[in-house]
Amino acid sequence: MYNKRKASYEMGRENFMSSQQLVNLRIDFAFKQLFGTSGNEDILIAFLNAMLQDSLESPIVSLQFADPHLHREHEEDKLSILDISATLDTGTKVNVEIQLNNNHDMIKCSLYYWGRLYTAQLQKGMPYSSLHKTITINLLNFVMFPEYEAFHTTGVLWNRQQHKILSSDIEVHIVEISKLMQQWRNEQVNPWEDLFVRWLLLLPANEDEQLTQTLEDIAMNQDPILQKAMNKWERM
């Protein structure tokens, strides 16, 4: 069935925009415009629900975009601007970063962003129990872990002795988009059935017309939020 669906792109549609004209969503300004602007909350919710289904106790119902600036407490502090910062209906904080090139310090950078978002929640007089889970998501356009095939890596605070999570408040996700693209070309993943794969494949779809048309088939047949995202993407 998947091969038949995948082959359906050959039929085409006269009005379909060529992938050559589509903006690269792995460029931060385009990514933020689609996933991080007011009015597109439902698009980010769909993406996060697909990605974090094993991390959250229940699906995200609503979220609010937060100020992406990590404000300096002291003049000498580093000024940082996040790609996307949001607060979920449960209070969980989420940061999503898109990275085109390997700067060789992604883990430390992600932990720094996590720490700033986590500590910023606590104001004077507030108990530590008021701190909410904080998740950082790094979408990488390069291979970071060549030693294994999996394109999605999740880091947590781990109790080595008891072999269980020490705290669920910290969670760092690494997604290697180039690995996923190779798996799609090898027909190892199925965007018709896997929501997470579907949304991730949207990011590099500008360079592959077959993939773009496959995603549009899926959007038109079974995913109205993806269809909204693709319509907005085509108008960029």
For the regions a protein language model found, what residue spans apply to each?
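Elongated, amphipathic alpha-helical interaction scaffolds
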Residues: 1-236
